[in-house]
Amino acid sequence: ARAMEELDQRGEAYNREIPVGIMIETPAAVMLSDILACHVDFFSIGSNDLIQYTTASDRMNERVQYLYDSCNLSVLRSIKLVCDNARARKVDVGICGETASEPRLIPLWCAMGINELSVAPALAGRTKYIINQTSKADLEPVMDAILAQGSVPAARERLDQILRELGL
């Protein structure tokens, strides 16, 4: 939005219909996502940073690396909150980072209503295949059960069970 204001001030022509979005990479952005959704067309969830900041971990530091877990319930619930707030304002949600192409999480992303997964080209075929095997309507009730799990291992096992049930 600020860039558009600057272009307007300089009298430069540009596409006024270009979608404006923001990255959701911190717990603070998650908590404000209901307010932020009023000002944008889309969210892009930066999963690598969100996991790191939510779990107080560092993927590159071997002393705390073990805390970095894509199936951490705080992370999954945070992403669900962002999706719910976005849906309430008709804001699209994408996710980037390693979790976007993590097989056990792809059905969960579909159930949450994530519109776009940003994945490495080498993983696009597998990711598309998993998406095509996934039914959002069938997985929405399962998603709530996963997010209500009492432990990360239990959530991970349920996610893996979904993949097995899908024949993946």
Predicted regions and their residues:
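Conserved alpha/beta-domain cores
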Residues: 1-168
